[in-house]
Amino acid sequence: MTQVFGEAGSGKTNLCMQLAVECVKNGKKVIYIDTEAISPQRFRQIAGENAKEIAREIIIFEPNSFEEQYSAVKEIEKLISDRIGLIVVDSATSFYRFELDQDESSIRSRRELSNQIGFLHGIARKYRLTVVISNQVYSDMASGTLKPIGGSGIEHISKTIIQLEKTGEGTRRAKLWKHRSLPEGRARDFRITNEGLR
């Protein structure tokens, strides 16, 4: 399971769409849980002239609440076939209300989010599928840095974690936070263009 996190406008949804398009171009189908309201125009730009054909190979869920997101995640396993090559959840945390206090609602929300991520991790392992989740950030007052929402549960389950950062007008940086075999801190700059990430 791969987690991609970053502030708003850092390129998370662009990356998720581009991964889905490339997966379809390689002959596989995609299951895509969209909580970010993908722009059809942006999808057409990234997918190119075959956008309609590519879109037919992407199974999209568009939940409107955390509960609907949970239902969509649970529905995924019924759709698994040898044609599925990628599962995307963009964003896993948009309906999740991050609360620093430990009230009962906050604890329940954390547990439900952990259950969803754990379920996706189980599907990834069982069916040998790639699962990509995008994640939002919060500002950690103690360190003065942006950190992914969801805490250590999502971090532990994610085998690869990539942070996307804004570095300028249209330019971004992808920084490796966690990987099994590559050193942390490795970074690559890229641009967001009409055709996707370059």
Model regions and ranges:
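Phosphate-binding/switch loop-helix module in NTP-utilizing enzymes
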Residues: 61-126
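Conserved P-loop
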Residues: 1-75
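Short, hinge-like loop/turn segments at secondary-structure boundaries
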Residues: 49-51, 105-106, 149-152
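Short amphipathic alpha-helical segments
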Residues: 43-45, 99-101, 144-146, 176
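Catalytic P-loop NTPase motifs of RecA-like helicase/translocase cores
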Residues: 39, 95-96, 140
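Phosphate-binding/switch region of NTP-binding enzymes
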Residues: 111, 118, 122-198
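Loop/turn-to-beta-strand initiation segments
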Residues: 28-29, 56-57, 83-86, 124-133
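Conserved RecA-like P-loop NTPase ATPase core
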Residues: 4, 43, 58, 90, ...
